């Protein structure tokens, strides 16, 4: 398992869910990816729901989708802030349109909704935003991880191992089918 040469952005804003930011960030680094924390530009450091800080490497308006292989969006309450910034939505939309991985867990489904990329897709999320996902035109599946082409979604921190395995497999080029649904939860 090697992600050497892969460039991954992890989005951050205040009130991010601690595990949903740090677990994927560290797993991607462990697998060899170059990982950068990308913020909205409103601050240089953001604080998690439980008080843990993360320092950003750049603001979204300083990053080009062409320079990334994936964007990971942690949950918590940060997605409600992230979705308010046009530069964040543009980055997520462009990464998705370029056929690269967009991965969202828990409440992070709000960002792909606001970026307009969920319509016609299969997805999962934290149960509290299930109606939002459905109203955005997605088919909701209650599974630990759902991969539909280059879109990967997951529900809660309990699902982080499957979420990260699926992201890594997608970045390694396995089971990417932009026209169909893939469930890699068994990896």
Predicted regions and their residues:
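Active-site glycine-rich loop that binds ribose-phosphate moieties when present
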Residues: 127
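Catalytic nucleophile serine of serine hydrolases
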Residues: 106
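Anionic-ligand binding patches
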Residues: 123
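Exposed beta-strand and adjacent loop surfaces of beta-rich binding modules
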Residues: 120
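Extended, subdomain-level signal for the structured scaffold at the beginning of enzyme domains
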Residues: 1-98, 102, 111-117, 130-187
């Amino acid at each position: 398992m090697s992600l050497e040469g892969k460039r991954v952005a992890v989005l951050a804003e205040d009130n991010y869910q601690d595990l949903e930011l740090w677990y994927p960030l560290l797993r991607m680094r462990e697998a060899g990816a170059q990982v950068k924390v990308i913020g909205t530009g409103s601050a240089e450091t953001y604080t998690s729901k439980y008080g843990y800080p993360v320092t950003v490497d750049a603001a979204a308006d300083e990053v080009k989708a062409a320079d990334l292989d994936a964007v990971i969006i942690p949950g918590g309450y940060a997605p409600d802030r992230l979705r308010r910034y046009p530069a964040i939505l543009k980055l997520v939309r462009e990464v998705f349109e370029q056929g690269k991985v967009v991965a969202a867990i828990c409440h992070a489904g709000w960002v792909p909704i606001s970026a307009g990329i969920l319509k016609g897709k299969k997805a999962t999320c934290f149960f509290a935003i299930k109606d939002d996902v459905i109203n955005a035109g997605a088919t909701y599946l209650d599974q630990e991880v759902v991969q539909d082409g280059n879109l990967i979604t997951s529900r809660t921190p309990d699902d982080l191992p499957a979420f990260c395995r699926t992201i890594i497999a997608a970045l390694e080029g396995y089971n990417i089918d932009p026209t169909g649904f893939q469930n890699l939860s068994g990896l």
